[in-house]
């Protein structure tokens, strides 16, 4: 059960959204990226839709909009290696839907259970286990000016002695160019808004019962992707991204006296990533482009034992004790290409960092009131206590507790509450004393003569960063009324106070005047030019001079600088988010079949950032490029015999376009998805069709364009930025998909 390390308990304390493989099929979900993009609690700032060169085709999970690095992603309950240019997030795009049994989304802080990163929540992808037979999948999808294809094969065997499952999937996507959509036709050609991708994925899961009470288990995965996109905003650049990930787990479980069970396992996860940015040598001062590469590795040894402690009148008190030793390392570097597209061997932005982590954890579940001692007003009462202590070799220790209370005053009503502390260790890439570049800016400064000054600004990392910390609490109510036993309604309130966040306090650019202004940055009015030269040497790059477009028409030199603006990463930012989640399901018989209704909605009451205690609070919800205040997904699925159909809607509420002068309202966006399935069951269909399931899915049935936002045009070079919010909208339009799934033998 995601959210607890104790076997055999019904984890009702923290809210968990569970989506089964059957539901994924009904909704026509073709990839894990599609799943998280439609999740109302997720904010899509890292996805294929962004068209970001550094992560083309990658998909990260960003619960509550607190950043992909603040959501822990697990595969079968274990960590994956980080990906991206700085190892800043876990790329889930390589996990095929065909290999999944279910997806659990825990929308609560969980560092007491899982350790670092579980601040906004946890997403746990659970692989299929008990399956007999073979399954072949083929899917083709079409949208205007683009096609995608998927083929997959799964083999499984399950007996009393053990089980094994092997799954492979290949996918190909043509991508999408800006000139293929009316709302981006003004972009300079060529320009890619969705990358072209090809991907291979393979997964294995197995277990063997050596004797009664002794089992060995293993799982393994491999994924490789190639993505291509063209960026022509500043200069023509073909970006080719080639990530590869692999890993596995080997362990054993043994039954102990008294109903206890012990587990020992070792796991490893690796992620390699290369980005080749090819330019036209004659138009780029540094030649033919650049390459960025990094490798992230995680290996761990885990031991735990859980079982019953003693009995109370309300039930059995259960506990788990465990320990973990983990090693992580990160290595990354960049280099330029010459006119022949060969490496110049002029490495810059080097990063090579490693650390080890030792952890101890414990958890106790105590049912105080149960069926045997229920009373009026207290039908059930239980508490959960958990704590995890971690010792990091690079920044120190962290102790994170969590407490949960669950109370049922009526058989149909359950009230729950949690409180806990969580943390996030700094990224290894952040702890390298590295300067990415040094910029020279025309800076708005009210304390300088004329209200402006020439500033030199180092941008990069620092090695003295500390861990980020958070306190979170939630309360909720679950309702299953006796008069409607098929109704299951859950509502939760969440509140996360997130301090010491690592970030770059970068200045903002005023697009009206192309001037930079404080947002907020530590400014040194007296500085040593030798320190600036040290920053330049660390970067390995020439000075990045932005004063070529200064309002007075003068391009300044480094010697003209009168300010040093320190834009290196700091631990000064704080964030706070609060809101409501609603999850409702209701099933009923209809027309000799079954109708299932569902709604999942998320509403932000507030979300705010503060870059330091001396700076004003910035609202970060209901504005462009930030989480929408309200998102919801709901629909109806009806099935009868071999046939099923469903209609789902996805809604994003209206929000503010703060770029417009004056600010304006961006309209809400509502899409409809329709699917139809027919299953040729064995014994009721010709042999060739027996075990075949046909699925037709239409996403965005009415081909609705994303809401328009104000188009930003740089006055000097005509560069254009997307006229839609890629974090809150999707440029694909209507997508029609046909899938054929065939089962061979088994069950």
Describe these PLM feature segments:
Residues 130-133, 160-161, 210-214, 257-261, ...:
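Short loop/turn motifs that connect adjacent beta-strands in outer-membrane beta-barrel proteins
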Residues 132-135, 143-261, 266-268, 381-384:
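Transmembrane beta-barrel wall of Gram-negative outer-membrane proteins
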């Amino acid at each position: 059960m995601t959210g607890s390390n104790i076997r055999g308990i019904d984890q009702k304390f923290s809210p968990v959204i569970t989506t089964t493989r059957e539901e994924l099929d009904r909704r026509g979900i073709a990839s894990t990226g599609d799943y998280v993009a439609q999740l109302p609690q997720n904010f899509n700032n890292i996805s294929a839709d962004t068209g970001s060169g550094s992560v083309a085709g990658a998909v990260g999970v960003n619960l509550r909009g607190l950043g992909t690095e603040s959501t822990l992603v697990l595969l079968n309950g274990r960590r994956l290696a980080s990906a991206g240019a700085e190892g800043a997030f876990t790329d889930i795009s390589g996990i095929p839907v065909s290999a999944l049994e279910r997806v659990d989304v825990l929308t609560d802080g969980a560092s007491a259970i899982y350790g670092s990163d579980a601040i906004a929540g946890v997403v746990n992808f659970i692989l299929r286990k008990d399956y007999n037979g073979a399954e072949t999948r083929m899917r083709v999808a079409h949208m205007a000016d683009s096609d995608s294809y998927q083929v997959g094969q799964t083999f499984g065997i399950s007996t009393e002695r053990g089980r094994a499952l092997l799954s492979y999937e290949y996918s190909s996507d043509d991508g999408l160019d800006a000139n293929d959509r009316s709302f981006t036709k003004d972009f300079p050609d060529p320009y890619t808004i969705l990358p072209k991708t090809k991907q291979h994925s393979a997964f294995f899961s197995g277990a063997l019962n050596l004797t009664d009470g002794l089992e060995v288990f293993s799982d393994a995965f491999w994924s490789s992707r190639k993505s291509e996109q063209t960026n022509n905003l500043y200069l023509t650049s073909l970006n080719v991204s080639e990530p590869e990930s692999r890993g596995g787990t080997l362990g054993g479980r043994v039954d102990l006296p008294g109903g206890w069970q012990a587990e020992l396992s070792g796991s490893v996860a690796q992620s390699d990533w290369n980005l080749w940015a090819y330019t036209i040598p004659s138009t780029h001062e540094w030649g033919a482009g650049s390459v960025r590469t990094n490798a992230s590795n995680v290996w761990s040894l885990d031991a735990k034992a859980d079982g019953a402690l003693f009995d109370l009148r309300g039930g059995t008190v259960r506990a788990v004790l465990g320990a973990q030793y983990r090693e992580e390392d990160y290595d990354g570097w960049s280099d330029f290409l010459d006119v022949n597209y060969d490496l110049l061997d002029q490495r810059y932005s080097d990063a090579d960092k490693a650390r080890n982590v030792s952890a101890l954890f414990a958890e106790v579940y105590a049912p105080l009131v149960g069926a045997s001692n229920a009373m009026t007003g207290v039908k059930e009462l239980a508490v959960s206590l958990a704590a995890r202590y971690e010792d990091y070799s690079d920044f120190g220790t962290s102790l994170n507790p969590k407490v949960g209370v669950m109370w049922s005053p009526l058989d149909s009503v359950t009230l729950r509450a949690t409180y806990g502390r969580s943390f996030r260790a700094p990224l290894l890439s952040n702890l390298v004393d590295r300067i990415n570049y040094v910029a020279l800016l025309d800076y708005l400064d009210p304390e300088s003569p004329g209200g402006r000054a020439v500033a030199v600004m180092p941008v990069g990392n620092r090695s003295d960063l500390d861990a980020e910390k958070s306190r979170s609490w939630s309360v909720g109510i679950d309702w299953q009324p006796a008069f409607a036993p098929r109704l299951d309604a859950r509502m939760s309130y969440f509140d996360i106070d997130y301090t010491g966040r690592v970030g770059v306090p970068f200045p903002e650019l005023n697009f009206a005047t192309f001037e930079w202004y404080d947002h907020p940055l530590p400014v040194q009015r007296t500085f040593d030019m030798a320190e600036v030269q040290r920053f330049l040497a660390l970067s390995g790059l020439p000075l990045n001079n932005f004063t070529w477009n200064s309002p007075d028409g003068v391009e300044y030199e480094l010697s003209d600088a009168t300010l040093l603006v320190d834009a290196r990463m700091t631990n000064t930012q704080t964030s706070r988010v609060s809101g409501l989640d609603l999850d409702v399901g209701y099933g009923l018989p209809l027309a000799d079949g079954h109708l299932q209704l569902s709604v999942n909605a998320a509403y932000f009451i507030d979300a705010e950032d503060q870059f330091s205690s001396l700076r004003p609070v910035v609202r970060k919800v209901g504005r462009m490029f930030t989480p929408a205040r309200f998102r919801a997904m709901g629909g109806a699925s009806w099935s009868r015999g071999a046939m099923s159909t469903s209609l789902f809607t996805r809604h994003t509420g209206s929000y503010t376009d703060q770029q417009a002068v004056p600010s304006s309202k961006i309209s809400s966006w509502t899409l409809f998805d329709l699917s139809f399935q027919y299953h040729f069951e064995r014994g009721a269909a010709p042999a060739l069709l027996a075990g075949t399931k046909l699925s037709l899915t239409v996403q965005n049935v009415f081909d609705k364009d994303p809401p328009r936002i104000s188009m930003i045009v740089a006055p000097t070079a005509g560069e254009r930025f997307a006229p839609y919010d890629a974090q809150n909208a999707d440029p694909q339009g209507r997508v029609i998909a046909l899938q054929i799934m065939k089962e061979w033998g088994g069950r």
